[in-house]
Amino acid sequence: MATHKIGVIVDSFRVGVKEGIKKAQEVGAEGIQIYAVRGEMDPDNLSPSDRKELLNYIKDHGLVVSAICGDLGGHGFAIREDNKAKIEKSKRIMDLAKDLETNVVTTHIGVIPEDSNHERYKILQEACEELGEYADQVGAYFAIETGPETAVTLKNFLDSLSSSGVRVNYDPANLVMVTGDDPIQGVYTLKDYIVHTHAKDGVMVKKGDPEFIYACFAEGLPENFRLDDYFLEKPLGEGDVDFEAWIKALKDIGYKGFLTIEREVGEDPEKDIREAVEFLKKII
């Protein structure tokens, strides 16, 4: 019997939420993750009855919600003046997650510096302390996605927090593509914190500065700069993530949650996602 369940991010289909839910069922997924930051999934746009209707629609398609994506973009929580509004929005996203019967909200918080005396480190700590405390209150996890920093730097940051509500959404491809960190060893490093994962693959083309790369996501690309010169996302099994070793590591640490497929590029996402589901089913 498979240890893990397979999920998909419905937004990866690029067809809207309800159509994405249908497609998730069609490709054989057991769960879904949904972006909930704007548009039809913005918590401000979903009444209690809307939430019940959506949850019933998900259940009617034989699915559960593995997590909600609450990534608010920009520099995450790295700019203190922006954080009051972002923290309140993130709390509302956690409320929505609970209404949709999941306890995980995933996000990027910004690039955590290695130096704990860095001013940004303290700003991120303050935001995560408040969000972690709220997560504890409502029975949720606010899960930082791996990528901009090494697993060791992320672990040290998490260890510095007083709340147990801040955890990890483990994306092995982000580590491969941006920091060059070992995605297998990272599982063991972050073993006490992983509550959700993204099944994604990729390659690093050449080493770049993670600070600069994530600033490009936040602010847009400079002229004549191409992210493809630094890294490429690939279909599962075609990049540098050793998925059999990754899944073994997850089993070793006792993780029994979702492997949620994320496909952010490609001309035929439905085909790629369907093949990714089949790929994972063969190795779990």
Each model region followed by its residue ranges:
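A short, acidic, flexible beta-alpha connecting loop/helix-capping segment that sits on the rim
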Residues: 13-14, 260-271
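Residues at the N-termini of beta-strands
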Residues: 31, 104, 196, 257-258
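Alpha-helix N-cap and loop-to-helix initiation/capping positions
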Residues: 45-53, 81-89, 115-126, 149, ...
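Acidic/histidine-rich catalytic cores of soluble enzymes
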Residues: 6, 68, 126-240, 277
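A short, acidic, amphipathic alpha-helical segment used as a generic capping/interface helix at domain edges
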Residues: 238-252
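Active-site acidic/histidine proton-transfer and metal-coordination neighborhood
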Residues: 16-20, 57-64, 76-170, 177
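N-terminal pre-domain/capping segments
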Residues: 1-102, 136, 163, 192, ...
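Conserved beta-strand positions
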Residues: 34, 107, 144, 170, ...
